[in-house]
């Protein structure tokens, strides 16, 4: 069965690879990339990324390439069916959330509404 059929959120190879490199730079193998949603931004909700060395009991975790992506249950409900990717291009390098639940998205891609 494919990853997208079994998991509510996809963690791409390019995102996992970048997380692996960033964790190596920090020299703390216990770090995980936490993705979360908060109120704010020009569209009502915004995505956030942080490194965290804790996983809460009710967090959702995806492991790939020896690193973990962690999402709290409140944020996960807004991200089901989406993906976390990493891109390097003319506009810079960044983690990107593709969210099929977002009705509108801000031009910068970091804010959305449902």
From Swiss-Prot:
Q: What Pfam families has UniProt attached to this entry?
A: Fe-S_biosyn (PF01521)
GO terms, biological process: iron-sulfur cluster assembly
| Superkingdom assignment | Bacteria
**What are the GO cellular component annotations?**
cytosol
Provide the cofactor list for this protein: iron-sulfur cluster
An annotated Gene Ontology molecular function? 4 iron, 4 sulfur cluster binding
The entry's keywords: Iron, Iron-sulfur, Metal-binding
Cofactor-binding details, from the entry: Binds 1 iron-sulfur cluster per subunit.
Q: Which residues bind iron-sulfur cluster?
A: 42, 106, 108
Gene3D superfamilies named among the record's database cross-references: HesB-like domain
Its subunit composition reads: Homodimer.
Q: Which family does it belong to?
A: Belongs to the HesB/IscA family.
Purpose of the protein: Required for insertion of 4Fe-4S clusters for at least IspG.
The record's listing under PANTHER family reads: IRON-SULFUR CLUSTER ASSEMBLY 2 HOMOLOG, MITOCHONDRIAL
UniProt protein name: Iron-sulfur cluster insertion protein ErpA
Q: Which organism is it from?
A: Sodalis glossinidius (strain morsitans)
Which taxonomic lineage does the organism of this UniProt entry have?
A: Bacteria, Pseudomonadati, Pseudomonadota, Gammaproteobacteria, Enterobacterales
């Amino acid at each position: 069965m494919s990853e997208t059929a079994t998991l509510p959120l996809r963690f791409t190879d390019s995102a996992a690879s970048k997380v692996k490199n960033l964790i190596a730079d920090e020299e703390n193998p216990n770090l995980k990339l936490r993705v979360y949603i908060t109120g704010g931004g020009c569209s009502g909700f915004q995505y956030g990324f942080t490194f965290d060395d804790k996983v809460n009991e009710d967090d959702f975790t995806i492991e790939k390439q020896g690193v973990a992506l962690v999402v709290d249950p409140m944020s996960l409900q807004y991200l089901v069916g989406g993906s976390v990717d990493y891109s390097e291009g003319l506009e810079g390098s960044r983690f990107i959330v593709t969210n099929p639940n977002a009705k509108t998205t801000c031009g910068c891609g970091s804010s959305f509404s449902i």
